[in-house]
Regions:
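Hydrophobic alpha-helical membrane context
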Residues: 19-20, 79, 302, 310
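Domain-terminus/edge residues, biased toward the C-terminal soluble/receptor-binding domains
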Residues: 186-192, 197-451
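Short alpha-helical segments used as structural interaction elements across diverse proteins
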Residues: 4-5, 64, 295
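Active-site-adjacent loops and short helices of periplasmic peptidoglycan-processing enzymes
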Residues: 21, 25-196, 206-209
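Sec-dependent N-terminal signal peptides of Gram-positive bacterial secreted proteins and lipoproteins
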Residues: 2-29, 432, 439, 443
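Generic detector of short alpha-helix boundary/capping microenvironments
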Residues: 17, 35-36, 58-59, 100, ...
Length: 451
């Protein structure tokens, strides 16, 4: 009986210790978050720092998230003066017919009616109007086919890797075919991008054209208000303030749904100066849940996790000197070494409580060094000689969306003072001293060898 009690106590103690071990195990970003979608990604918006990813490099259907690329190309065309917001568009027969297809998301456009590019843009960004996307594509490139070429070219310029665009709206080609002379690609093909590429597009859209949020944040608007064509446009992003799945700080960006792509959503929200970008693609729908709720529920999960766990913190101050590398040797200078320091503070997106996991790493500019690892005078005060970056002890660091983010995680290392080149006499004396020093060292070594 006593032995049985001891055995039971031992087992209970072991279970308790194992449980404590599980509780005390350091948190892992990938392990903390489980998104129910075929692909997903979570990114900090100012740096492009990837905080979570799931199957993010595989191309998937994107449906109407396509319209972010159409928006980018339109905003670029406006910036370059090729298109004006108050420019009038006269609706041709094919676009008018498409706009009256009630099985697609649309606002009705009268044949031969005129609408401003701003009207068409807002109907596309807010209500995901497909005919409006086609109208914008024809305005910019002359045809859907030409616009698809521009989309793919821009994708390459933006550094996207796993994508293919066949139309401006994100529709399946079978739905587009009745309204164009010829579809691009297969008869039932759709646009595809990876979750990482979709996040990169959103990142570039937000950073290159932040005014996109002025429209994507509109919860409801009347199209062509005051005319016979006026139409109430509720935003398909139900997480906007005032809508049924509202989320604090939500102000964009684009939903998407087709049979091929499933329910998708690229979201962005900002609180207290911190902005995040989320992408969910082909979300899993639980019993009793509809696909609209599912994509917003998974997005909410990601954003709650991000706002609760991450912040931007200064890790290194300006004028920081790397321990053990406060100076560099200088060849042919009046001084034989020069002090170095960082020229700016270094901040990073860091998970709460993990600041100590990041250690500075000094990287010299090899082009500045001779074969002996020395700088060569003259050296100017403030001259860049390398950079400091931060390395995490965690092996699962996911990196950044773009090189811009990677570069933002570095601080230049510069010379603290100028070092002038020594005159010919000093250099000659050093050379002579070095010559006799070498002879003396040689003699010393030889003599030592006798004993």
């Amino acid at each position: 009986m006593k032995r049985s009690w001891i055995q039971k106590s031992f087992v209970c103690m072991m279970v308790f210790m194992m449980a404590m071990g599980v509780v005390q195990k350091p948190a892992n970003a990938q392990g903390d978050l489980d998104v129910n979608a075929k692909a997903a990604i979570l990114v900090e918006a100012s740096t492009g720092k990837i905080l979570y990813e799931k199957n993010s490099d595989t191309a998937q259907g994107i449906a109407s998230m396509t319209k972010m690329m159409t928006e980018y190309l339109l905003l670029e065309a406006v910036e370059e003066g090729k298109v004006k917001w108050d420019q009038k568009y006269t609706v041709p027969t094919n676009v008018s017919k498409m706009s009256h297809n009630t099985s697609l998301s649309n606002v009705s456009l009268r044949e031969e009616g005129t609408y401003t590019i701003k009207d068409l843009y807002e109907s596309m960004a807010i209500y995901s109007a497909n005919a409006s996307a086609m109208a914008i594509a024809e305005t910019i490139a002359g045809s859907e086919a030409n616009f698809a070429k521009l989309m793919n070219k821009k994708a390459e310029e933006l550094g996207l890797e796993n994508y293919k665009f066949v139309n401006s709206s994100g529709l399946n080609n079978k739905d587009l075919a009745p309204y164009v002379d010829q579809v691009v690609g297969g008869a039932e093909e759709e646009n595809v991008m990876s979750a990482k590429d979709t996040a990169t597009l959103a990142y570039r859209l937000l950073n290159d054209y932040p005014e996109v949020l002025e429209t994507s944040s509109i919860a409801k608007k009347m199209f062509a208000e005051g005319t016979e064509d006026q139409f109430n446009m509720p935003n398909w992003n139900w997480m906007l303030p005032g809508l049924i799945r509202e989320y604090e700080g939500m102000d964009g960006l684009k939903t998407g749904t087709t049979d091929f792509a499933g329910a998708c959503f690229t979201g962005t929200a900002e609180r207290d100066g911190m902005r995040f970008i989320t992408v969910v693609m082909n979300v899993d729908v639980s019993a009793g849940e509809n696909s609209y709720d599912a994509r917003f529920n998974e997005t909410r999960k990601m954003l709650d996790y991000a706002f609760a766990n991450y912040s931007i913190e200064e890790v290194l101050p300006a004028n920081y000197q790397v321990k053990g590398q406060k100076t560099l040797p200088v060849e042919k200078g009046k001084e034989k070494e020069v002090q170095i320091k960082t020229d700016s503070p270094l901040s990073m997106v860091i998970k709460n409580g993990e600041k100590d996991q990041y250690k500075p790493e000094f990287v010299l500019d090899k082009k500045k060094l001779n074969d002996e690892g020395e700088l060569t005078a003259p050296i100017k005060k403030g001259e860049k000689v390398g950079y400091v970056t931060l390395k995490s002890s965690e092996k699962n660091d996911l990196g950044y969306l773009t090189d811009k983010g990677t570069n933002a995680s570095k601080s230049s290392v510069v010379a603290v003072e100028s070092v002038e080149k020594a005159n010919w006499f000093v250099l000659s004396m050093r050379a002579v001293g070095g010559f006799f020093g070498d002879i003396w060292n040689s003699i010393t070594s030889t003599v030592k060898g006798w004993f």
